């Protein structure tokens, strides 16, 4: 596989590069697939034919770096230029090698037909066409990331649409091309579903008189805040990804942050390592997102729950940390992405061995959440 040294790699310092996925037009993505195939055929037809290894950007933590914002408030995780090899002649990577070409074949067909598919739809297509190579969604997801790492272009450029779990509600008007504007304050407690079509999101007109954007970890908490119309008392827009954020929800938030750069973005999560990990995904991106990790990072602030809120919660509402929590805490502490006050919060969780859920605040009444958020905002208690 021939590689251009300048392809999709941005130099920061003399020893530091950011490897990233380009956003391409369909014909440009097809061209990169064609070049990959032609390079393979050229090697096979040479006087000394051989199966070439695939050089893929290494998506492990050892190849990750942190860019701490200097000219902006945004910091993010990114992958550097260390490569890993996938070979047909290696028993451990042979199937992965074939999967890459199978996924590229389907993507090429999708792009020719000017269609888009979700990764779930892609899984069922590959399961039908190549059952010996694709038996799980995880194998498809990894293969898609391998193709992104090989071609250096985004999933969306390959015709793969993000599956979105995201919802938005509050003081925001959204107008998709050729459609009537949607008032997100009038969509009921279920909110308005964020589309997985990134091109549509990119071309949606946004209008707001909000003063804050508030990300809520849990769907049930989002539902409560919207049902109580808290956005009428705190001029804000609520967003939830129902847990760990998907690409579409992160794209939507990033679009809002660039459209309305003066709006603070506040995050409400459970006081546990998983809640902090969710916040960090919005704030820095994640290694699991590969070459697209850095693209949608936003300067979010942690409004709660935090250690100084424990005095608001009955002792019996605190729950012991689970083994999974301890694993996440260890991973976060070793990642070197956390700022000092985040480390202090995480260390307190580990020291106490306890976790607290947002719902524990209901001991003060079901309408207390809005008052809690308002107090935090007025006192400027977010980090």
Curated annotation (Swiss-Prot):
Name of the protein in its database record: Meiotic recombination protein SPO11-2
Residues at the catalytic site: 124 (o-(5'-phospho-dna)-tyrosine intermediate)
Gene name for this UniProt entry: SPO11-2
Organism: Arabidopsis thaliana
Domain Topo IIA-type catalytic per the UniProt entry, residue ranges: 24-167
Chain's role: Component of a topoisomerase 6 complex specifically required for meiotic recombination. Together with MTOPVIB, mediates DNA cleavage that forms the double-strand breaks (DSB) that initiate meiotic recombination. The complex promotes relaxation of negative and positive supercoiled DNA and DNA decatenation through cleavage and ligation cycles.
Result of knocking out the encoding gene: Plants show a semi-sterile phenotype and a drastic decrease of meiotic recombination, indicating that SPO11-1 and SPO11-3 are not functionally redundant. SPO11-1 and SPO11-2 are both required for double-strand breaks induction. Drastic decrease in chiasma formation at metaphase I associated with an absence of synapsis in prophase, due to the inability to make double-strand breaks (DSB).
The organism's place on the tree of life at top rank: Eukaryota
Main location: nucleus
């Amino acid at each position: 596989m021939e590689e251009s040294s300048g392809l999709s790699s941005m130099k920061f310092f003399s020893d530091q590069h950011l490897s990233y996925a380009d956003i391409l037009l369909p014909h440009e993505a097809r061209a990169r697939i064609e070049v990959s195939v032609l390079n393979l055929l050229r090697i096979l037809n040479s006087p000394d034919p051989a199966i070439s290894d695939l050089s893929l950007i290494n998506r492990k933590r050892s190849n990750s770096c942190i860019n701490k914002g200097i000219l902006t408030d945004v910091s993010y995780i990114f992958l550097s230029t260390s490569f890993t090899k996938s070979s047909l002649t290696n028993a451990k990577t042979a199937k992965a090698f074939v999967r890459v070409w199978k996924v590229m074949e389907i993507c090429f067909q999708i792009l020719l037909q000017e269609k888009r598919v979700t990764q779930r739809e892609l899984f069922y297509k590959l399961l039908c066409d190549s059952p010996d190579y694709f038996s799980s969604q995880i194998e498809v997801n990894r293969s898609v990331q391998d193709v992104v790492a090989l071609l250096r272009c985004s999933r969306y450029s390959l015709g793969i649409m993000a599956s979105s779990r995201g919802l938005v509600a509050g003081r925001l008007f959204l107008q998709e091309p050729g459609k009537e504007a949607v008032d997100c304050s009038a969509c009921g407690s279920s909110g308005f579903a964020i589309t997985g079509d990134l091109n549509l999101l990119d071309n949606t007109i946004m209008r707001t008189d909000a003063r804050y954007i508030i990300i809520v970890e849990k769907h049930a908490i989002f539902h409560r805040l919207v049902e109580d119309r808290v956005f009428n008392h705190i001029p804000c827009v609520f967003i939830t990804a129902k847990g760990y954020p998907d690409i579409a929800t992160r794209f939507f938030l990033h679009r809002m942050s660039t459209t309305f750069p003066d709006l603070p973005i506040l995050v409400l999560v459970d006081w546990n390592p998983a809640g902090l990990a969710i916040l960090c995904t919005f704030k820095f991106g994640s290694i699991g997102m590969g070459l697209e990790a850095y693209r949608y990072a936003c300067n979010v602030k942690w409004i709660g729950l935090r250690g100084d809120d424990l005095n608001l919660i009955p002792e019996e509402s605190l729950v012991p940390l689970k083994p999974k929590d301890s694993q996440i805490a260890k991973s976060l502490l070793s990642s070197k992405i956390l700022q000092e006050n985040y480390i202090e919060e995480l260390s307190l969780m580990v020291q106490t061995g306890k976790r607290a859920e947002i719902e524990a605040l209901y001991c003060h009444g079901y309408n207390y959440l809005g008052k809690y958020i308002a107090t935090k905002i007025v006192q400027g208690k977010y980090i």
